[in-house]
Amino acid sequence: MAPTPPKDRPNRYTYAQAGVDIDAGNELVRMIGPLAASTKRPGSDAALGGFGGLFDLAACGFKDPVLVAANDGVGTKLKVAIEADRHDTVGIDLVAMSVNDLVVQGAEPLFFLDYYATGKLHVDVARDVVAGIAEGCRQAGCALIGGETAEMPGMYAKGDYDLAGFAVGAVERDGVLPRGDVAPGDVLLGLASSGFHSNGFSLVRRIVEDNRISYSAPFPGGDGASIGEVLLAPTRIYVKAMLKTIRETAAVKAVAHITGGGFVENIPRVLPEGINVEIDGASWTMPPVFRWLMELGGIDDTEMGRTFNCGIGMVVVVREDQALEVSDALAEAGETVFRIGRLIETVPGAARVAVKGALGSGK
């Protein structure tokens, strides 16, 4: 015997009744078309709507290119954006996390694709997110050539969404980083970060929530900016400054993107065995937002250093006699540069990355 259907069951079902609004999706595509078009660069037409995005590598002038690919997300920084109801910066973060991973291998970002998933599509929110993605692409010089918007009823809490990004770049085969001549005595240059970037936000949120602090509250000494605004400062995109410096000086040996794991986990990724790292913690000043969180949560120096960038978002390895030239080139390109340490020969039993003094303790 067949079960008796509920009295409120519709006679005919539609996708919209199941929670998927195709019309809203089409409206979003219409709204973001001009945003994608604003990222056009040689090799792309930056037009959306096809089954796949096209890119003409031959138009970029490479002679013997190697393709480099990266993908990443924004993590739980998205929860801060949702709580603060500000969605126009996390798209920049999304692009930054992938393109910064490309440039550390010497690669020029060429194109980007995004994935936006939510339980219910709110077109205005999604449009703000994509506006940030387009801004990030413009900062990095890459084209937004496609993406996916997934409306999945029942998969996410009300108002939540998730992001993933995918970037592809290219570098001449003989220009791939790190180079093979990284050696003890080389100098480490640190490029200032814009804040937490997109790492460690599960700890940030836990501390803020346990202290019952509103994201709309003013940040102490923040000139009127709210805590949410300070925390949502977008990840700095180092691509154009790094590419210019790499090409003009030919002096960059290796580059590390300082993300989750901090100096301890990220710098060794670009070094050969037999080389250790010595960091002078007093060579730069940790930005106020890090000090604020450190004091609010009682976080010790070790935990700060293995969770956050502590004010340095990228580390560049150069020969000592070329450090000033590279530092000046990066500064001229708009970066704030610190000489933060050096490479030394491995000492048995010593930590791979040793920090003298507290990170960012300079005055």
UniProtKB/Swiss-Prot annotation:
Disulfide bonds: none annotated. It is found in: Cytoplasm. Keywords: ATP-binding, Cytoplasm, Ligase, Nucleotide-binding, Purine biosynthesis. Pathway: Purine metabolism; IMP biosynthesis via de novo pathway; 5-amino-1-(5-phospho-D-ribosyl)imidazole from N(2)-formyl-N(1)-(5-phospho-D-ribosyl)glycinamide: step 2/2. This is Phosphoribosylformylglycinamidine cyclo-ligase. It comes from Parvibaculum lavamentivorans (strain DS-1 / DSM 13023 / NCIMB 13966). One of its GO terms (cellular component) is cytosol. One of its GO terms (biological process) is adenine biosynthetic process. It is an enzyme of class 6 (ligase). It catalyses: 2-formamido-N(1)-(5-O-phospho-beta-D-ribosyl)acetamidine + ATP = 5-amino-1-(5-phospho-beta-D-ribosyl)imidazole + ADP + phosphate + H(+). GO terms for molecular function: ATP binding; phosphoribosylamine-glycine ligase activity; phosphoribosylformylglycinamidine cyclo-ligase activity.
